[in-house]
Amino acid sequence: MRTFLRFSFVLLLTTSLSGIASAQTIALTGQVTDRSDRSPVQAIVSVLPNGTSKTGTDFQGRFSLEVRIGDSLLVEAFGYGSKRLKVTSSQPLAIALAPNQVDLGEVVVTGYGSSTKKEMTGATSVVKSEEITKLNIPRMDQALQGQVAGVVINTNSGSPGGSTSIRIRGLSTFGDNDPLILVDGVVYDSEGLNALNPNDIASINVLKDGTASIFGVRAANGVILIETKKGQKGGAPVFEYASYLGVQQTAKRLGLLNAQEYAVLKNNAFLNGGQDQPFANTALGVGTDWQDAVFQSAMTSSHSLSATGSSNQTTYSIGGSYFTQDGIVGGDKSNFSRYNGRVNLSTDMTSRLRLNSVFLFTHEERKTLPENGIGSVLFNTINAYPTEPLVEEDGRYSYLALVSDIINPIAQMANTYNQTGVNKFVGKEELAWTVNESLTWTNRFNYNYALVDGRVFSPLVWYGPGKAQNTAVNADLDAPMVTLAEGFSLERGPSVYQHRDTYGDLTFESYLNYDRTFGEDHHVKATAGTSVFTRQGKGLGAWAFNIPNNSWDYADISASQAAGGYLNGASSFFFEERLLSAFGRAEYAYKSRYLVSGVLRRDGSSKFGPNARWGIFPAISGAWVISDEPAYRWAQTIDFAKLRASFGVAGNDQIPNFAYRALLNGEGVYPFNDLLTPGVAIGRASNPDLKWETTRQANLGLDLRIRNALNITLNAFEKR
């Protein structure tokens, strides 16, 4: 009875208020369309500030809503920027929405969780797959060049498959400045990025400021989070094939002297020095264009095939690719090729338990030439004088005899043999249990294994009299004699160096994610977990001399004909490192416009001395979504405005393993009873107090979106 009376009273009160308001309201009509093509848009039109009065458009984009003159309206549609406007008359409205350039509700992967762009309080940048695939690039990290503010990609090598250096907000240390790179949660180094097919990348998220402290002792140089493409539920399987074939050429060459210009200039120099002119006839024409001889057109091609789809419980994304690239210097002697296979699976084992699996296999082969600096092919190319031919009349390569440290670059390429092969296996097994609507427990095991085989062959070569690069004593390719000890000499012929190295990473992580909204105004998120990381590397290398027939075809250490094997040798290495971590993060949002986040991580690393192994890395950040304020007045021009601030402490553990231990170095070789015996000496003292570098970073940022078309991000930071 009491319920009925209460309902009757509310109904009576509502009816009375409606009757009073009806005298002051108008029936406003209008249509919402796409600004680009004027097609109808299904949208929600609500009255501000509280939005309790709202309506939706029909399939033609039309709506009708009871409003009052002076009311402010908010028009929202999925995939479009919102629009605010004021009611000034009863005339029908024509509202055009612009497609979102940046969807503020888009989910972005962060450390051990995810967030929407609107909720993020740190300085981050995201590159999507659409921006990557249109670039036709061989390496994933090249997608960041010019795409992300504060990120600089330095090319260490211009040859195919060459490495790059990624720098986020400049240099942080005199040591290793490489950022932490995670692909689907698996740790990669910058060299390992060669294994990825850029067409498989779904997104790249760059963490630039102190909020990267969730990754603790490895986050001082920034963090790059890469997600590969995954299957989507619903719909038929989708097959994609992408291919391109290209030709590469040098865009610009140096303006060097031709033969006649060189002869005239050199004659004048000798004349001014009171010496006889070296060229009796300077009418030599163009002569040899060494750049034209060395630089050539190089082919590159890429093919990739992928299938994406789902069944009742499983989504999948499967892909394979092939990429090859010749060098514009050296052709197939400077080549890179890559075969890649990838499988991403996500299976709902129960309604609350999900298994995510990632498998990646890559085979790479790379051939290289001497590069970067004195003695490289390009150094010899630009310093070779144009008055000398490529090949003499007797068929041998010209010696370039006038300068002792310059050799014929064509001969250099012909006698260079340097080949490396890599097999890489990467995977992740992740089990996510949805405990309830607010709590998820994730456990994952990652592995990253690489097998590297390399071979370098050094034949007997004669580049000309006085050349330091000669490995033979004369043009007849006679081998030099090497004195190992007094009265003990051996012939040193062509040599080969071979090595096999293995590297393996294992990671186990377990963490809880809590996400709950209290009432309409309070949103709380929290993460807590632990991580165990171990890395091991080992390798064995050997070199051998006197390879038969001075030929690459026989370049194997087993074929060595060195007398007694004295010239031959071997080397090895081994290292192991471990990292134990505990981490936590708490986030709070009030009315989705006042945001605050705190991070705390504790790391223990085996790289540091026993007195300084553990460190604590905190961070705090906050944001204010100004455009969500009821009194915000610039909505028609600046659709979105957010002010951010953050401060965090991160560490850097990029130092050699065992650096805190004493080191013995090999010193000298001595003959004892006709046996050659190496000596040792202390090369480095121990340091049990060796610890990580610490970086403190403060950041103040502003995010703006103007007229749903122009996105502006401003950051001011101090990093020390």
Predicted regions located by residue number:
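Short, small/polar-rich motifs associated with maturation and membrane association
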Residues: M1-R342, R354-N356, G427, W462
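Residue-level recognition of beta-strand termini and adjacent short loop/turns
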Residues: I69, S89, T350, T434-N436, ...
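Surface-exposed loop/interface segments of Gram-negative outer-membrane beta-barrel transport/assembly proteins
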Residues: K233-V286, I328-S334, N340-K424, R444, ...
